[in-house]
């Protein structure tokens, strides 16, 4: 029995009965919606047959909060809610803006000093830049709020972002513009070099 498997651990088993609830066509690029999902640049591509969030353009049309999230957020959960994110559970903005605000809320709430971003090339540089801007502002808010409470609040290092770009090799002059347009401070390449040398290349644009 599926439920008993969890209960024997013991783990509370809870099920979502609203199987027809989903992000919706405004949020998700998905072949099932009759849209093309295979852009050559990888930005509007359903990687590994997974739906893709429509976050390529931060200035895209505003979207509303999906119904399943509205239902979830109707019941306050003070033990797990992030207060800094509550103001972004309403209204409308582009998908990229919602995502950037939600992620930056963790920075504002917990004083996170940087992000390591995975599979960077599948999200536009403009959207990454937006995340960098929101996170930088969020960290400044956290530091101002926590002076005298946390030693890190007195740090002056800017918010740091490093990105993983498969088969990137290196780009010391930032010709790819991941630094200038994407807001990244460094990049790492997890491509496996067949020669067995330089397996990981870490470059800092400056």
Tell where the protein language model's regions lie, with residue ranges.
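Core domains of carbohydrate- and sulfate-ester-processing enzymes
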Residues: 2-79, 199-206
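Low-complexity, polar-biased intrinsically disordered regions enriched in Pro/Ser/Thr/Gly
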Residues: 81-88, 143-149
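Active-site-adjacent bridging/hinge elements
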Residues: 69, 73-77, 99-109
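Active-site mouth loops of central-metabolism enzymes
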Residues: 53, 84-97
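Solvent-exposed, acidic/flexible segments
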Residues: 43-46, 92, 96, 128
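Active-site-proximal helices and loops of the catalytic beta/alpha 8
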Residues: 3, 19, 101-206
């Amino acid at each position: 029995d599926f439920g008993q498997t969890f209960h024997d651990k013991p783990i509370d088993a809870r099920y979502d009965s609203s199987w027809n609830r989903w992000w919706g066509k405004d949020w998700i690029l998905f072949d099932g919606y009759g849209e093309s999902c295979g852009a050559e640049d990888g930005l509007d591509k359903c990687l590994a047959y997974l739906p893709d969030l429509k976050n390529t353009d931060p200035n895209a049309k505003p979207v509303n909060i999906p119904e399943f999230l509205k239902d979830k957020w109707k019941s306050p959960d003070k033990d797990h809610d992030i207060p800094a994110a509550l103001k972004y559970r309403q209204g409308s903005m582009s998908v990229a803006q919602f995502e950037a605000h939600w992620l930056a809320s963790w920075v504002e709430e917990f004083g996170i000093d940087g992000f390591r971003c995975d599979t960077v090339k599948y999200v536009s540089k403009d959207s990454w830049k937006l995340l960098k801007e929101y996170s930088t502002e969020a960290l400044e808010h956290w530091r101002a709020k926590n002076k005298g409470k946390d030693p890190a609040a007195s740090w002056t290092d800017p918010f740091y972002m490093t990105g993983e770009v498969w088969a990137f090799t290196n780009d010391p002059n930032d010709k790819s513009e991941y630094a200038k347009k994407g807001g990244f401070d460094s990049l790492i390449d997890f491509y496996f070099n067949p020669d067995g040398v330089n397996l990981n290349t870490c470059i800092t644009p400056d």
